[in-house]
Amino acid sequence: MYKTFLFDLDGTLTDPKEGIVNSVLYALKKVGIEEVHISELDSFIGPPIQQSFIERYNMSEGEVERAVFYFREYLKQRGLFENNVYEGILKLLQQLKSSGNRIFVATSKPTVFAKQVIEHFQLTNYFEDIIGSNLDGTRIKKEEIIAHILQTHEELNKEEMIMIGDRKHDIIGANQNGIASIGVLYGYGCEKELTEVSATYIVKDVEELYHFYVEKNLIQQ
């Protein structure tokens, strides 16, 4: 039975689309790149930001550093809070917590920013720890973030842990650390993406995620 829940942040707990897209556009303007296919910038939601800039614009290391600097500049000023908690998430966290489960945030977003988002939406009390990447560009992969949680909480039992996320990076991170995973379809991944990396379970929305927990007797109604 699962007793420890690792939640991705962007696209799983909150919908950060407006803030992330605006942060990317701000950064691109600063480095002299014009993006005409703005709808395709959804791909920046979830993966490490450095990776997204490299894959889409074939940036050099120096260009990535500049782009990330400006991305974070806008994010800190406005982008973090151009964001919304998905409907049903608060109830889900309340039920998981009151049923005695342990809950963590495991995100590729820098820890300092993730904590600001969680605090802004008054969700801090539901999480035992909030773990993200480092501002210096280290610990950006989801497998590294999950491994860090396991290392700093040695008492955790992998067989009782499950990672919940909307992108393949969440599932890959779980697989590489030997824990189960739930891929959610209400974020920014698709069923094909999550199936190809062997998500343990897939749910279509927050309501189905809630009922999954009920059926598994993981929460008390």
Give the predicted meaning of each segment.
Residues M1-S43:
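Active-site neighborhood of HAD-like aspartate-dependent phosphohydrolases
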Residues T4, K142-I171:
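Conserved Lys-Pro-Asp/Glu-containing loop-to-beta segment of HAD-superfamily phosphomonoesterases
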Residues V24, L92-I118:
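Substrate-recognition element of Asp-dependent hydrolases with the DxDx(T/V) motif
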Residues A27-L28, P48-E61, V117-H120, I145-Q151:
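Helix-loop "lid/cap" segments that line or gate small-molecule binding pockets
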Residues E34, T124-E128, V203:
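Conserved H-loop
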Residues I54-L90, S99:
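Metal-dependent phosphoesterase signature
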Residues T124-R139:
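A short, structured active-site edge motif that brings together acidic residues
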Residues M163-Y201:
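Acidic, Mg2+-coordinating phosphoryl-transfer loop and its flanking beta/alpha structural elements
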